[in-house]
């Protein structure tokens, strides 16, 4: 076998003309030799990392993420596996797309993956991470989460707001009756319902159109922009030297504007509450802001929070309680309209339990509505409000399923793909609520086949609050009305296109015609 070095030496000695060529070839050979040696040296290290698709310089795998990230990641993970390592710019990103892998992250190694990645969007809109959802894992997060779990979203507190949910559902039913036989924008109605419930529970009054005057109209617009921005990606978070783009594309200016408008609005509401702080009454009738201001005054509470923390927590209630809740309602009704068999079965259950009562169905009536709960679970399986959940981040190096995961790796858990896994569900793309009858699977974070609200330390603390709104609203609208699509369209004609962003609701509003049943 020829020795390349000997060949080069012979060429060098044979002719002075060939000397430059010899040195060039030698240099190329040495570079190739070093590259080969380096790659073989690190083969063992690389083999212990999760599988990765090829990436580009600077942007990494960002070019492979389309308009619908959860769908793009599904296609990639089908080729590379349920634990897949990507790079968004310079940031390592672990994509988790199976129930088994999610269990490893959210249960076995939950503490390691309990942090949140930094985000320019969250930093500016949520008071520099002073809320619960985006706060870094640590003592502050433990304190404010404890406030939410024990004081705002406990079972007793959620029950205490039952009258608010029933009253606002009754108002929605009246509005539907007033427009019966006409085309209704159900998406808009669900947005208003959830906004009104959250406003009354969190702030003590409604701020919807016609209720809060000019301030109500402005708040509705600001809240819409707030939700849109939470689902926006700032490229500078992944490619730092492109941070200047937010000043060119207007994102930075829009963030500053919306953050200031929200802050001004909440400051006004806080001042109104403080001016009436002497008001007495049953503790169960106090709104969230009343409770937070009272905790702020209690120096003996052991959980000191300042005014900024109060505002951050209140904003969390809107971020988690409006867009995600109305999205679940919207998709449930969409699937019912697409599947008349399921709609009829649900109506038969509800009407069989409640009868011909014309007043609003109450939460006491929901206890025996097992098919209603199955419809809700099936909706969340196919349409989790946040398909990739809120990202997590590893705090240290850790081994997961034999792979080495480095500290500061972002983690995206695809609740959307897990819910469509054919290994877990028969005919996963079909809407069949019967699969959840008598099988015990729930959405509260213990069953990793269904985790629309996450699991572990960072599980959404408002699950019970959100589902209480969903169930009473859905039960009432299928009980009181028969439904049809406009222009005698069939269920197959419904456009199922999703929006892009943090939550995935329908891109086009859901419109239907209601016919009073009684």
Curated annotation (Swiss-Prot):
<feature type="binding site" description="axial binding residue">
    <location>
        <position position="460"/>
    </location>
    <ligand>
        <name>heme</name>
    </ligand>
</feature>
<feature type="glycosylation site" description="N-linked (GlcNAc...) asparagine">
    <location>
        <position position="12"/>
    </location>
</feature>
<protein>
    <recommendedName>
        <fullName>Cytochrome P450 736A117</fullName>
        <ecNumber>1.14.-.-</ecNumber>
    </recommendedName>
</protein>
<dbReference type="GO" id="GO:0016020">
    <property type="term" value="C:membrane"/>
</dbReference>
<dbReference type="InterPro" id="IPR002401">
    <property type="entry name" value="Cyt_P450_E_grp-I"/>
</dbReference>
<keyword id="KW-0325">Glycoprotein</keyword>
<keyword id="KW-0503">Monooxygenase</keyword>
<dbReference type="InterPro" id="IPR001128">
    <property type="entry name" value="Cyt_P450"/>
</dbReference>
<keyword id="KW-0349">Heme</keyword>
<feature type="glycosylation site" description="N-linked (GlcNAc...) asparagine">
    <location>
        <position position="185"/>
    </location>
</feature>
<keyword id="KW-0408">Iron</keyword>
<dbReference type="Pfam" id="PF00067">
    <property type="entry name" value="p450"/>
</dbReference>
<keyword id="KW-0812">Transmembrane</keyword>
<feature type="glycosylation site" description="N-linked (GlcNAc...) asparagine">
    <location>
        <position position="275"/>
    </location>
</feature>
<dbReference type="GO" id="GO:0016705">
    <property type="term" value="F:oxidoreductase activity, acting on paired donors, with incorporation or reduction of molecular oxygen"/>
</dbReference>
<feature type="transmembrane region" description="Helical">
    <location>
        <begin position="17"/>
        <end position="37"/>
    </location>
</feature>
<comment type="similarity">
    <text>Belongs to the cytochrome P450 family.</text>
</comment>
<dbReference type="InterPro" id="IPR036396">
    <property type="entry name" value="Cyt_P450_sf"/>
</dbReference>
<keyword id="KW-0472">Membrane</keyword>
<feature type="glycosylation site" description="N-linked (GlcNAc...) asparagine">
    <location>
        <position position="356"/>
    </location>
</feature>
<keyword id="KW-0560">Oxidoreductase</keyword>
<keyword id="KW-0479">Metal-binding</keyword>
<dbReference type="GO" id="GO:0004497">
    <property type="term" value="F:monooxygenase activity"/>
</dbReference>
<dbReference type="GO" id="GO:0020037">
    <property type="term" value="F:heme binding"/>
</dbReference>
<dbReference type="InterPro" id="IPR017972">
    <property type="entry name" value="Cyt_P450_CS"/>
</dbReference>
<dbReference type="GO" id="GO:0005506">
    <property type="term" value="F:iron ion binding"/>
</dbReference>
<keyword id="KW-1133">Transmembrane helix</keyword>
